[in-house]
Amino acid sequence: MLRVLLFLVVLVGAALAAAAFVPLKIVIEFAHLGKIGFTTSGTEGTAWEGRIYDAHLGKIALGDIETHAVPAELLKGRLRIDMTGTDPGTQLSGGFSLGWGGIGIDALNLTASVPGEGPVPSGTVFVEGLTARFPGTYCGTAGGNARAYIPSPLAGVVPAGSMTGPAMCRDGALTFDLASDTGEARQEIEINATGGYSMRATIKPRNALIAAGLSSKGFTPGPDGYVYQTERRL
């Protein structure tokens, strides 16, 4: 029995090691990154070392990306591709992986501009140390943090500033649960496996006049405050 298990371990390790020399384009396709809106004008090299040209995550421009495999992850039954962005504006680093436990995001750091939607103004999102696993098409585990800087007042009520919070899995979706420093506003951003996402902004009005103003901007009353919700694609 021990010999059989050892043989299987060696067999899987050899298969993953061989996978490191598969063309990078095929690895990206196998990881189904296109489903979440990841596109590129071209690639060169293999999973071991390569380059991705003019990458985009939906409407977010990532620029050119240098990639390389992480040998230590092969011993864990996973093929991990680390990425380093060449665009200083995105500060992209981290990677993605596949193998035991499904497809994953590994220690991802990213800065991206996010367009506004209705009463929610545009801003900049800073993702820090995002790690997640997707067994199948749902989010199984997630960790890391996100910070959103909003340069203008949220719904004309909450002062400009930052909202911060953790990354987590909620109802099978990768979720960022952000809150303002004052606690009067929250934003929940849920990203699904097909590249769609929902954004839910909740504001606790301080008085009836503010509540009326929120209603006029599309917010609806709820148990935790006034809520504005929308669904979009990356």
Report the location of each language-model feature.
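Extended terminal
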Residues: 2-6, 33, 163-234
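Hydrophobic membrane-insertion alpha-helices, especially the h-region
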Residues: 2-23
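Alpha-helical transmembrane signal-anchor/signal-peptide segments
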Residues: 24-42
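N-terminal beta-strand/beta-hairpin edge segment
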Residues: 38-132
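Beta-propeller and related beta-repeat scaffolds in trafficking/envelope systems
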Residues: 62-72, 125-127, 137-174, 212-233
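Short, well-ordered strand-loop elements centered on a beta-strand within folded domains, enriched
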Residues: 75-84, 100-107, 140-146, 175-177, ...
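Short, solvent-exposed aromatic-acidic interface loops
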Residues: 84-88, 147-153, 179-182, 203-207
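Charged, low-complexity intrinsically disordered regions
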Residues: 121-124, 134-141, 194-197
